[in-house]
């Protein structure tokens, strides 16, 4: 397997997973803050 392709796939998965994760963290932080 090519390392560059594996790196791009890992980066893509990280970006896709980081989107909803950040929203959940912000929502939980705002809820706990209130």
UniProtKB/Swiss-Prot annotation:
UniProt membrane topology term: Single-pass membrane protein
InterPro entries registered for this protein in UniProt: PSII_Ycf12_core-subunit
Membrane listed as a keyword: yes
Gene Ontology cellular component annotations, sorted alphabetically: chloroplast thylakoid membrane; photosystem II
TM helices/strands, residue ranges: 5-25
Main location group: plastid
Cellular location(s): Plastid, Chloroplast thylakoid membrane
GO biological processes: photosynthesis
Record has Disulfide bond as a keyword: no
UniProt keyword annotations, A-Z: Chloroplast, Membrane, Photosynthesis, Photosystem II, Plastid, Thylakoid, Transmembrane, Transmembrane helix
Subunit structure: PSII is composed of 1 copy each of membrane proteins PsbA, PsbB, PsbC, PsbD, PsbE, PsbF, PsbH, PsbI, PsbJ, PsbK, PsbL, PsbM, PsbT, PsbX, PsbY, PsbZ, Psb30/Ycf12, peripheral proteins of the oxygen-evolving complex and a large number of cofactors. It forms dimeric complexes.
UniProt cross-references to NCBIfam families, sorted A to Z: PRK13686.1
Family as reported in the entry's similarity comment: Belongs to the Psb30/Ycf12 family.
Function, as annotated: A core subunit of photosystem II (PSII), probably helps stabilize the reaction center.
The protein's name: Photosystem II reaction center protein Psb30
């Amino acid at each position: 397997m090519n390392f560059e392709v594996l790196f791009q796939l890992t980066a893509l998965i990280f970006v896709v997973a980081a989107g909803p994760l950040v929203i959940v963290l912000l929502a939980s932080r705002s809820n706990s803050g209130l």
